[in-house]
Swiss-Prot record:
UniProt KW keywords: Cytoplasm
Predominant subcellular localization, coarse grouping: cytoplasm
Species of the source: Bacillus amyloliquefaciens (Bacillus velezensis)
UniProt cross-references to InterPro entries, sorted A to Z: Barstar (IPR000468), Barstar-like_sf (IPR035905)
Signal peptide, first to last residue: none
Protein name, UniProt field: Barstar
Known role: Inhibitor of the ribonuclease barnase. Forms a one-to-one non-covalent complex.
Length: 90
């Protein structure tokens, strides 16, 4: 089981968030750092099962002007489509 940890205290922008996702999920170099690219990777690249632990989510949400909420929604949609993702927010 793969575990990806996002530390919200270290996320200062949506770019920081995408770079963290790229590292934690071992996304390809050509990852486009946008919601469509994230969806493509979640539904065709990432190995499952996956545990996403997002620490200090509310802080990262504020610092990314709700960009973090949009990213979280992509993970929730991928889960609804059958991707084996466990999401832990703290």
């Amino acid at each position: 089981m793969k575990k990806a940890v996002i530390n919200g205290e270290q996320i200062r922008s949506i770019s920081d968030l995408h770079q963290t996702l790229k590292k934690e999920l071992a996304l390809p170099e050509y990852y486009g750092e946008n919601l469509d690219a994230l969806w493509d990777c979640l539904t065709g690249w990432v190995e499952y099962p996956l545990v996403l632990e997002w620490r200090q989510f509310e802080q990262s949400k504020q610092l990314t002007e709700n960009g973090a909420e949009s990213v979280l929604q992509v993970f929730r949609e991928a889960k609804a489509e059958g991707c084996d993702i466990t999401i832990i927010l703290s």
